[in-house]
Amino acid sequence: MDGIIPLYKERGMTSNDCVFKVRRILHMKKVGHSGTLDPNVDGVLPICIGQATKVVDQLVHSGKVYTGEITLGLSTTTEDLDGEVVEEQQLTEPISTEKIKETLASFLGESIQIPPMFSAVKVNGRRLYDYARAGDPVERPQRKITITQFDLQGEPEFDAKTGRQTFRFIAGCSKGTYIRTLAVDFGRKLGLPAVMSDLTRLKSGGIQIGSCVTLAQLAEAADNGQLADILIPLDHVFEENVKIALDDDQWAKILNGVFLTFPEQTEEILALTYEGHIKALYQVANAKQHLYRPYKMYLQNQGTH
């Protein structure tokens, strides 16, 4: 059985919990997820099974879309509401809608982000959250991220009693972006403490939340022999790649890992198909000669079965 399960991860579960439960439901070991979601975050979590586990890296590197909420007026150790409050500053008046929109827009494009201490990023073989819990000092790595969308959703809400303001947003971003940290950085630009107070992943790996299934729905489909109705073929991952249909001679060469020439092509990566399915990714080896070399092989890919 091969394919991608468009799973909706519920809150209170880790991504690895989901993998474990899918293994039990499907009675198979070859299962992997394509991008960690924190326990307090729900939304799209593509689960790869069988041959599709070979495309986990491609899914991980895809862009993501989130919707969530930022609260101005307090900050925590974890940059969300799970941590201990480390700073509070009451707002005497609300930040204007125009100022919020302007500040959100300032994040668009490429920038450098430092991941939060309570994160799974590894430094010298240890997760940052291990350093944080042990109280050990560590220099966090800088990451280049790209924000493609950061828009206000609805109207901001101001609570005069608590001196806090909340607003919802939608954000499109590159792999490895921490929305928690975006929330903190947003507040910093306004001279205010801030936290991410809610988050849902709407899209990952080209999979929208509306097409996802819960673990309970997956189990029901498995019991009823209807998994094929849920599984997304491995080929879905490469929808945006330029595709080349191979003839029999080229296919024979692919099987032997031979370099191939595609005179009309200039793309960095080509998705090569045979009998209607992606069989390999080839990467440019010599641009002037239009020569391509093997990059990723999916020779056993037959779609979902």
From Swiss-Prot:
- Answer whether the UniProt record assigns the keyword Lipoprotein to this protein: no
* CDD domains from the UniProt entry: PseudoU_synth_EcTruB (cd02573)
InterPro entries listed in its UniProt record: PsdUridine_synth_cat_dom_sf, PsdUridine_synth_N, tRNA_psdUridine_synth_TruB, TruB_C
Q: Where is the active site?
A: D38
Gene3D superfamilies, per the entry: Pseudouridine synthase
Give the enzyme class.
isomerase
UniProt record similarity statement: Belongs to the pseudouridine synthase TruB family. Type 1 subfamily.
The protein's name in its UniProt record: tRNA pseudouridine synthase B
